[in-house]
Amino acid sequence: MAAAAAIAAALLRRSTSSQHHRRILLLPLLSHLQRAAPRSPSPWDPPPHHRFFFSSDVTAEGDSKPRPPLDGKQLWREVSTSEPATGASRLPKATWDAVVALLRRFGKDPAMSDQALALYIPASAFPTYARRFRHFLPARLSLESAEHLLSLPADDAHALLLPAFAEFCVTHLADELRKHESVMAAADLTAPHAWYPFARAMRRRVVYHCGPTNSGKTHNALTRFAAAKSGVYCSPLRLLAMEVFDKVNALGVYCSLRTGQEIKEVPFSNHVACTIEMLSTEEPYEVAVVDEIQMMADPVRGYAWTRAVLGLKADEIHLCGDPSVLKIVRKICADTGDDLEVHQYERFKPLVVEAKTLLGDLKNVRSGDCIVAFSRREIFEVKLAIEKFTKHKCCVIYGALPPETRRQQAKLFNEQDNEYDVLVASDAVGMGLNLNIRRVVFYSLAKYNGDRMVPVAASQVKQIAGRAGRRGSIYPDGLTTTFLLDDLDYLIQCLQQPFEEAKKVGLFPCFEQVESFAIQFPDLTFNELLDKFRENCRVDSTYFMCHQESIKKVANMLERIQGLSLKDRYNFCFAPVNIRDPKAMYHLLRFATNYSQSRRVSIAMGMPKGSAKNDTELLDLETKHQVLSMYLWLSHHFEEDHFPHVQKAEEMSINIADLLAKSLAKASWKPTSRQQAKPRRENEEDNDVEQASDDNAKNDSEDGYERSISRIKPFMRKRLDRPSQDPSSLNFVA
């Protein structure tokens, strides 16, 4: 905090100087300069090879006297009062080069760039200002001070330079700082708890239900929700909101449903089940339940959970999830003045790791198994192989399926009076569905992240594995294992790890904040405006700005359309569209174009004649449902007159979901992709594996489907840095 205080003092002196008559540039710096500058031990004891920096401190016998460390104020005083060296430098060439190298590293240090925001220096401008500082400092620096700087660890040296850098900017760049001031003030995302004055006027009771899957935490919160006079349930998924809506109404409690695509207002209801983005922070409630609270740290959607925690007008707020964001919730409650209670939960029955894997052969699948694969292609390959080489029938669940189809597949799997006794699913199975799973089998523990194959995060492995076993089902005991023996060690390693503590949670500006910022840049496109906002926004150490890649891609596509207001563009960019699906993007562009021309937006999409006969037709059904879902979402976010075919879209959506369910029941074809094939593996071996999977007809044998190469094993060479739990805390079965 010494650096923060020094910068504050620098700004205050300059702003009150009678010579400059500058208006105050001072910010609440302590909120922005969170990281205290590391301090050297006192008294200062230089390293042995720099023992004799200061000739005045060296005695005739060669003993050095302790000298207090140079601080930022002394450094600035020295360089600001000395003239730049002319002719021969006052520093030896080696020392000069080392100081310049240090200043280059200072200009590339993200921590210094973050702290420079307190001076109204945006991240994009920091390298330029740091370069000017680099040209200014070395010629004025004494040998003693230079050697002192070079003797320090990098972080300490940067912290010592920061106050001098601040003084330099305020002295020499004040006019430029003033230009940045109004821009950065409009992009100020600090102290977000102050955005909700009505919530701050309340002293809320926050109850954190902390525990793993299958521990009863959400059940207890929902019991309190149903018993309250009024309440809201905030879900991460439309599917989960629909499930709570059905259950609560079945209990005789009137409850409405609000999702982006569907709004059902039940007469006389004081309860509502909604998706987290559809939460109203204007309505008062007695009880609110926010599910999967750990999603606050999600890099894309985390802002919605943060908004709920900060803005809910509820006397009682129940947060359900794992402990990863508990520390941050404590800090937020301290900022908001709310009371926090923590209720700890354990699984009803421990999750057991089955040491005997499937040994790379899907013939070892058993009833009640859920095979988890991390790509649509693998899901259908596994389903095809299981149904070809065993007596089992498979249900399928993955993210691109409509919620209605996923519910139908889950119901089919849960029922005991049919032949569908195996589930093949993606990570979408990790939340939102109650499933009678006996054993979770990881087909792979590596996934494609859009660039390369990476290990599945330990937290995600825990979430998915925890779906095995459910209280009250025919499989109360949960088992988990892997398809390949080589993957088992990584599974065990993930389950042993404690939950990783989140460092920050997400924020994203509301439309009013973007609108206020846009006044500063009337000539920028919306895409450029988003870039400029991110570049200039300031957040404190508890928060981060959520990623906006999908929003920016949509914004870029819509730039060619004339006649859209800023708010129109903002809303269209949040529409639920799969940016990797060209057909879905085309329809969004068409919707926006028609809207901009004040024309009624048509669906312009025919109803399929029947269920899919191949994977191309199945993909087309998925896309059609996504387009209809997007149409319904837009109808709730724009005036109804512009989207008049809501009833038709709802009917088509239901019919297509039914066709998808019928298509999945008879799916027995080789999977394809929405786009042309892209390289998805890191080495030739993996490519060979994928080719082998594609050519099932060539590789099928009486021995069944096999994949003998582990995709996680190469990553196992790198040990995870986080400490593991005692292995005795895990349960194993042969």
UniProtKB/Swiss-Prot annotation:
Biased composition (Polar residues): 725-734
Location of the transit peptide in the chain: 1-60
Keyword set, alphabetical order: ATP-binding, Glycoprotein, Helicase, Hydrolase, Mitochondrion, Mitochondrion nucleoid, Nucleotide-binding, Nucleus, Transit peptide
Listed GO MF terms: ATP binding; ATP hydrolysis activity; DNA helicase activity; RNA helicase activity
Compositional bias segments (type: Basic and acidic residues): 62-76, 695-709
CC cofactor: Mg(2+); Mn(2+)
GO cellular component, one term: mitochondrial nucleoid
Annotated ATP binding sites: 211-218
GO biological process: mitochondrial RNA 3'-end processing; positive regulation of auxin mediated signaling pathway; positive regulation of cytokinin-activated signaling pathway; positive regulation of gibberellic acid mediated signaling pathway; positive regulation of response to salt stress; positive regulation of response to water deprivation; response to salt stress
Catalytic reactions of this protein: ATP + H2O = ADP + phosphate + H(+)
Listed Acidic residues bias regions: 684-693
EC number: 3.6.4.13
Chain segments carrying region Disordered: 58-88, 667-734
Top-rank EC class of the record's enzyme: hydrolase
Family of this protein: Belongs to the helicase family.
Purpose: Major helicase player in mitochondrial RNA metabolism. Component of the mitochondrial degradosome (mtEXO) complex, that degrades 3' overhang double-stranded RNA with a 3'-to-5' directionality in an ATP-dependent manner. ATPase and ATP-dependent multisubstrate helicase, able to unwind double-stranded (ds) DNA and RNA, and RNA/DNA heteroduplexes in the 5'-to-3' direction. Plays a role in the RNA surveillance system in mitochondria; regulates the stability of mature mRNAs, the removal of aberrantly formed mRNAs and the rapid degradation of non coding processing intermediates.
Quaternary assembly: Homodimer; in free form. Component of the mitochondrial degradosome (mtEXO) complex which is a heteropentamer containing 2 copies of SUPV3L1 and 3 copies of PNPT1.
Protein name, per record: ATP-dependent RNA helicase SUV3L, mitochondrial
